[in-house]
């Protein structure tokens, strides 16, 4: 199993990061992609990817942090992307749910990172919330130039999922699907995601699966819970968990060109 979305730089992991990584591998996780959400976090993610085996990182600016975007951001991302441990540009995209940065700032940063990914021929790791139509408008001109693209933490509708798959995007599914209320629509569309386009992730320390038993004492999510998410996804897709683990591992190897 490969976790394509771990926020290992989070302060929630500051006291026991080594233990968190050890628990993940002990649980059967074979590799992890550590996400960068701004320049500083991307630099930290790279350091952690160098520190732990079978870990890689992304370099980018999240829509929440898009107000920080500057020409220096572009230079920093390019410098990071030239490191072998950095296998994707992002996390980038649009988030019109909270608008911590204005839509204009988000679009500017997203388009700049699409250009970087296309020019460097490196996959792009994307976020989209409450911005589907505008997201596709900005993404579409770049699709032919990008070597690969993943929409991580997908929580949209079946129609939105199909629009992404039709464009060749990989779809990242988190423990959100384990929520008996909020995750129901996502659960119902799982069988319609092509197996060759499915990736799995925890988005730790966020999105702790609500159906873990026994219930954890902490609300902090960990990559060690990835096997639980995989088993639930396999159940709702009607597939064997071992087969699905092998399939999603193969997808991660194909998209990110990683060896684990």
From Swiss-Prot:
Function: 3'-5' exonuclease that prefers single-stranded DNA and RNA. May play a role in the H(2)O(2)-induced DNA damage repair.
Stated family: Belongs to the metallo-dependent hydrolases superfamily. TatD-type hydrolase family. TatD subfamily.
Record's keyword terms, sorted: Cytoplasm, Exonuclease, Hydrolase, Magnesium, Metal-binding, Nuclease
Molecular function (Gene Ontology), one example: 3'-5'-RNA exonuclease activity
Any one cellular-component term (Gene Ontology): cytoplasm
InterPro entries: DNase_TatD-rel_CS, Exonuc_TatD, Metal_Hydrolase, TatD-like, TatD-type_Hydrolase
Species assigned in the record: Salmonella typhimurium (strain LT2 / SGSC1412 / ATCC 700720)
Compartments in which it is found: Cytoplasm
Enzyme Commission number: 3.1.11.-, 3.1.13.-
Protein name, UniProt field: 3'-5' ssDNA/RNA exonuclease TatD
């Amino acid at each position: 199993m490969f976790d394509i979305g771990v926020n290992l730089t989070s302060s929630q992991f500051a006291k026991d990061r080594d233990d968190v990584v050890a628990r993940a591998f002990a649980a059967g996780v074979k590799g992890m992609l550590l996400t960068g959400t701004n320049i500083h976090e991307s630099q930290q993610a790279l350091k952690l990817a160098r520190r732990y085996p079978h870990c890689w990182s992304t370099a980018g600016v999240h829509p929440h942090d898009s107000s920080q975007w500057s020409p220096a951001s572009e230079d920093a991302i390019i410098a990071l992307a030239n490191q072998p441990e950095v296998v994707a540009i992002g996390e980038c995209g649009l988030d019109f749910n909270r608008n911590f940065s204005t839509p204009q700032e988000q679009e500017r940063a997203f388009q700049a990172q699409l250009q970087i990914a296309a020019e460097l021929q490196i996959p792009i790791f994307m976020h989209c919330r409450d911005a589907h139509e505008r997201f596709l408008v900005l993404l579409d001109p770049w699709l032919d130039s990008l070597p690969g693209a993943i929409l991580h933490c997908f929580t949209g509708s079946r129609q939105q999922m199909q629009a992404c798959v039709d464009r060749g995007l990989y779809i990242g599914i988190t423990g959100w699907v384990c929520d008996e209320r909020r995750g129901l629509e996502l659960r119902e569309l799982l069988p319609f995601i092509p197996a060759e386009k499915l990736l799995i992730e925890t988005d730790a320390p966020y999105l702790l699966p609500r159906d873990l038993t026994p219930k954890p004492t902490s609300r902090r999510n960990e990559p060690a819970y990835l096997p639980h998410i995989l088993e639930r996804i396999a159940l709702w897709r009607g597939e064997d968990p071992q087969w699905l683990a092998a399939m999603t591992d193969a997808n991660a190897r194909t998209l990110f060109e990683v060896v684990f």
